[in-house]
Regions:
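Positively charged, small/polar-rich N-terminal and surface patches that mediate targeting and assembly
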Residues: 1-103
Length: 103
């Protein structure tokens, strides 16, 4: 299949509509019947605020996260419409890819 690999970058403690962004995105992805999502937790990062974000022994809410998915063009359009209509502000990257299963 042809489509996109989308990566959303955020930090663990950030919320949107009273939910953690990761959970909000996963809920929307399920509603749109997108087949899967992978969440990666990173040790350290910094973004547009130029602050270092990292996981700490006592505090994990500042830990950087990436939410990754592979979607068709139609799914991509629907997902970004949901994001726009809810006014979620989140960094993303989107690349054209071929994806599927080996057998």
């Amino acid at each position: 299949m042809e489509g996109y690999r989308i990566v959303f970058s955020t930090i663990r403690g950030r919320k949107h509509e009273n939910e953690y962004i990761k959970d909000w995105l996963i809920k929307k992805v399920k509603e749109l019947q997108i087949s899967g999502v992978t969440v990666l937790n990173a040790e350290l990062g910094y973004g547009r605020d130029n602050k270092i974000h990292s996981s700490h022994f006592f505090e994990l809410t500042d830990e950087p996260e990436e939410i990754i998915m592979h979607v068709t063009q139609v799914q991509c359009d629907k997902l970004f419409e949901e994001i726009r209509s809810s006014k979620l502000s989140i960094f993303y990257s989107k690349a054209k890819v071929e994806f599927g299963f080996t057998s």
